[in-house]
Amino acid sequence: MARRRRHRGPRRPRPPGPTGAVPTAQSQVTSTPNSEPAVRSAPAAAPPPPPAGGPPPSCSLLLRQWLHVPESASDDDDDDDWPDSPPPEPAPEARPTAAAPRPRPPPPGVGPGGGADPSHPPSRPFRLPPRLALRLRVTAEHLARLRLRRAGGEGAPEPPATPATPATPATPATPARVRFSPHVRVRHLVVWASAARLARRGSWARERADRARFRRRVAEAEAVIGPCLGPEARARALARGAGPANSV
């Protein structure tokens, strides 16, 4: 037979202890009937009064240690108390908001006054590669000739007259003869494959093919007409023409 469980009502709330009740050596434990033991402690000591201008009394001890309490103005060190102290620094002047432009250093080779700097050697002038310089010179000469041709020669600047060099009597009047060197140098030229291919397929190749085709056709015609031009063929033709059928 199962034992019936005794029903208990809701638990009564625990009575709050007195404010500031902290168990100390002078605390006493008392118990009352139908109640839990209560702790009766001695009245807590009053906290020390906060310093003037300090944190409020509601702050905890840990928070009081980290709070900064400003001191009075009389506690500050005054410069007048120190005879050897330097004079106070003047207040900084108001600076403009926009930064002043920095002076740029002169380029290398230029002195402070704008002239050439004797201590710095002059830089080497820029020179074009030989191929580009030659192309530029040829182009300039070609454009000058075109300009003179279009202008018709009017107003064109005359070329400067070159002073004639007097012929020295030591110079022989006969022209110099060409002398061939006994040493021959062979230099291999490099050509493009496309240029060589075009040279092989040029006009001379076409003419050679035409000549070969003409010889072949002449040989074929000679093989057909050749037997008719021989002496035997001529005699047969004359005998056939002298017959009675052909007589008038």
Swiss-Prot record:
Annotated region (Interaction with host EIF2S1/EIF-2ALPHA), positions in chain: 218-233
Important for interferon resistance: annotated segments: 190-248
One of the GO BP terms on file: symbiont-mediated suppression of host autophagy
Keywords from the UniProt entry: Host cytoplasm, Host nucleus, Host-virus interaction, Inhibition of host autophagy by virus, Inhibition of host innate immune response by virus, Inhibition of host interferon signaling pathway by virus, Inhibition of host IRF3 by virus, Inhibition of host RLR pathway by virus, Interferon antiviral system evasion, Modulation of host PP1 activity by virus, Repeat, Viral immunoevasion, Virion, Virulence
Keyword Repeat: yes
Disordered: annotated span: 1-129, 149-174
Biased composition annotated in UniProt, kind: Polar residues: 24-35
Broad class of where this protein is predominantly found: host cell
Key word Calcium present: no
Signal peptide feature range: none
Bias (Low complexity): 164-174
Amino acid composition bias (Acidic residues), ranges on this chain: 73-83
Region described as 5 X 3 AA tandem repeats of A-T-P: 161-175
Role this protein plays: Inhibits the establishment of the immune response and of the integrated stress response (ISR) in the infected cell. Plays essential roles in viral nuclear egress to mediate capsid transit across the nuclear membrane. Facilitates nuclear egress cooperatively with host C1QBP and protein kinase C/PKC to induce lamin A/C phosphorylation and subsequent reorganization. In turn, lamina disassembles and nuclear egress occurs.
Sequence ranges of Pro residues compositional bias: 45-58, 84-93, 119-128
Domain of life, per lineage: Viruses
Sequence repeats (start-end): 161-163, 164-166, 167-169, 170-172, 173-175
UniProt protein name: Neurovirulence factor ICP34.5
Source organism of this protein record: Human herpesvirus 1 (strain 17) (HHV-1)
Chain ranges for the short sequence motif Bipartite nuclear localization signal as given in the UniProt record: 200-218
Subunit structure: Interacts with host PPP1CA; this interaction forms a high-molecular-weight complex that dephosphorylates EIF2S1/eIF-2alpha. Interacts with host EIF2S1/eIF-2alpha; this interaction is crucial for the specific dephosphorylation of EIF2S1/eIF-2alpha by PPP1CA. Binds to proliferating cell nuclear antigen (PCNA), which may release host cells from growth arrest and facilitate viral replication. Interacts (via N-terminus) with host C1QBP; this interaction allows C1QBP to be recruited to the inner nuclear membrane by ICP34.5. Interacts with host PRKCA. Interacts with protein UL31.
Interaction with host PPP1CA: region residues: 175-188
Motif residue range(s): Nuclear export signal: 128-137
Gene from which this protein is expressed: ICP34.5
